[in-house]
């Protein structure tokens, strides 16, 4: 049975799924050299009254090629699942990601859940071949790079 025959057979059983990633015209990759380079991207997060979790997609040259809002939560939490974080990153053929979320109450200290999420994403990214470069926490008081403040979360390979 060839793939054409298989497709004909399967279309009577289940619908074929098609996923597409649509890039905005005119957007150009933006190089990232350090966490401060992301300030212009995360600035809007500082003003939200509910938690938002965002993933920035990078190419092999550490240039931001896209982003997606993974989740929008409550004033104190945002549900984040690795599947949702990496779905768009894989579709975008991302080499790496940087994730960021806001703390509406103003704290820049990572919660135990923030640490656990970071560890889970790093492990999932390693399995998928998409590196997690950093996890930023932002608030009206500034931003905090977990890569800089908690380097032990990133195992040396």
Q: For each of these PLM feature ranges, what is it?
A:
Residues 1-18, 59-61, 71, 75-157:
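Active-site-proximal loop/helix of nucleotide/amide-processing enzymes and allied scaffolds
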Residues 12-69:
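Long amphipathic N-terminal alpha/beta scaffold segment
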């Amino acid at each position: 049975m060839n793939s054409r025959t298989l497709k004909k057979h399967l279309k009577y059983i289940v619908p074929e799924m098609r996923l597409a990633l649509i890039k905005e015209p005119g957007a150009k990759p933006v190089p990232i050299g350090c966490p401060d380079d992301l300030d212009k991207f995360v600035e809007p997060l500082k003003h939200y009254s509910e938690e938002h979790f965002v993933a920035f997609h990078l190419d092999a040259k550490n240039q931001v090629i896209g982003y997606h809002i993974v989740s929008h939560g409550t004033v104190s939490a945002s549900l984040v699942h690795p599947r949702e974080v990496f779905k768009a990153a894989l579709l975008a053929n991302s080499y790496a990601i940087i994730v960021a979320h806001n703390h509406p109450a103003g704290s820049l200290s990572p919660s135990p859940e923030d640490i656990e999420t970071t560890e889970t994403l790093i492990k999932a990214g390693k399995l998928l071949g998409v590196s997690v470069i950093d996890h930023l926490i932002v608030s009206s008081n500034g931003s905090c790079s977990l890569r800089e403040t908690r380097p032990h979360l990133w195992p040396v390979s």
